[in-house]
Structure formats: structure tokens, C-alpha cells
Amino acid sequence: MRAEPGLSKRASLERLKTAGLELATVFDVGVAKGTPELYGIFEGVRYVLVEPLEESRRFMEAIVADHPGSLAIHAAAGREAGEASFVVSPNLSGSSFILNPKHGRRRTVPMVTLDGVAAEHDLSGPYLVKLDVQGYELAALAGAEQVLGQTAALIAEVSLWGDRKGVGMTQFLPLVAWLQERGLVLYDIAAIIRRDLDDAITEMDLVFVPASSPLRANVSYKGPEQFAASTARRRGGFGLD
């Protein structure tokens, strides 16, 4: 698979910052080896890394060391706290709760809710939540109702091919609808991933913000100078001064 050129989480986050987004806490849920484009953009924030893979521990600890006051939670994010059976894939990054066990090996891992983590560690919003949990997004979000109420932006990876493996993977429309019911609407596309087979889009990283966000307060498409320049270009196309 390949990423669409010109799109990235960092570029999207920098646009959010330029537009005035303010944050106190950043949840990186599904860390793997880290999400470098997520770190260092917003000053003074706490990073909360949530990842069940034991193989990710050293990467998480290095990130926390670079960002004092941040947390490494060696557990999965779900709808309730406890333990769960996790399938570890050979490439590690594809590990998931919904992966067919024949494609990996089972491992019991601790599970937390983001609401529970926020309460236990006295975290505060505004939050940014990044989710990359291999189709388990809705389950992770179900345990984050309180956090979502203080979320200024959410980035979630989602498949456009539906549940192609029939294992319960979060799908595009249900995710958008679920978030919209909670007041979060689509704001930006941070990444588009195309499959090798035919370059069709397989998944995207979507950026959501509250419908009431100040980022959406201005409904104009252009400023006065941009409007005047656009009008002049269009008139010029018709041969008018």
C-alpha cells in the first residue's frame, strides 16, 4: 500500500494549530513504534501513549523520556477495563483484537478505558485523540465518552472497504455517524492510503472536530482580498476587465 503524496498528520495538525487549536493532553492510542508527526507541534501538552504490544514498550518509554510529564500505558483501549485476548500479527503493526487467530498468535493483554485513564491520572482537556487500532476504533471510543466531551480534535484511521474480512472491523459510515451523534464532525483528511493491486483507496486518516468548534465559526470560503482576486480571474476568463 502507498500513501497519497501531499497529505500527512503533521500537515493537518499544523493547520489546526495555525487556525488556533489549543490542547492540554494528546492521547496516542495505538502507538506501535511511535507517531512522530504527532509530537512536538503543540507546546506544553502531556502525551498519553496507550498500546498493548509489549514489543512497543521501549519505544514508548523513549518517547516519554523526551516529553517529561507524559505517560506510557501498556494496555489496550476498549469499552471497559479488564483483560482481553489480542492477536499478535507476524509484522506486529497489524496486531488487533479482531484479527483472525490463524494470522497470528493470541496474547492476553490488559485493557483500559480512556475515561478511566483520564480520571486515574487527573488528565484535563482540551484533548486530541489519535486512534490507530486496526479496526477496533468504535470499541475504544465507547470507553471514552467523557474524554470525547472535552476533545478538540480526533484523528482516526478507517477503512473504506467495509469489513472486508468479516471480523467486525469499524467501517467508514458507522464511525462518522457515531461521532456525529456525539457532536464531532469531519474536518480534514490527514492521509489517504491506496492498495497496491489497483491504486484504489483502502483507508484514510480522518480528522474530526466538535461541530461547535471555533475552527468552524467562519463559514466563508474566502477573505475579501481572495474573493476580489478570484472574481478578477473569473471575469478575465470571459474576456472582461
Question: Each predicted region: which residue ranges?
Answer:
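Phosphate/nucleotide-binding beta-alpha loop and adjacent structural elements of enzyme active sites
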Residues: 1-241
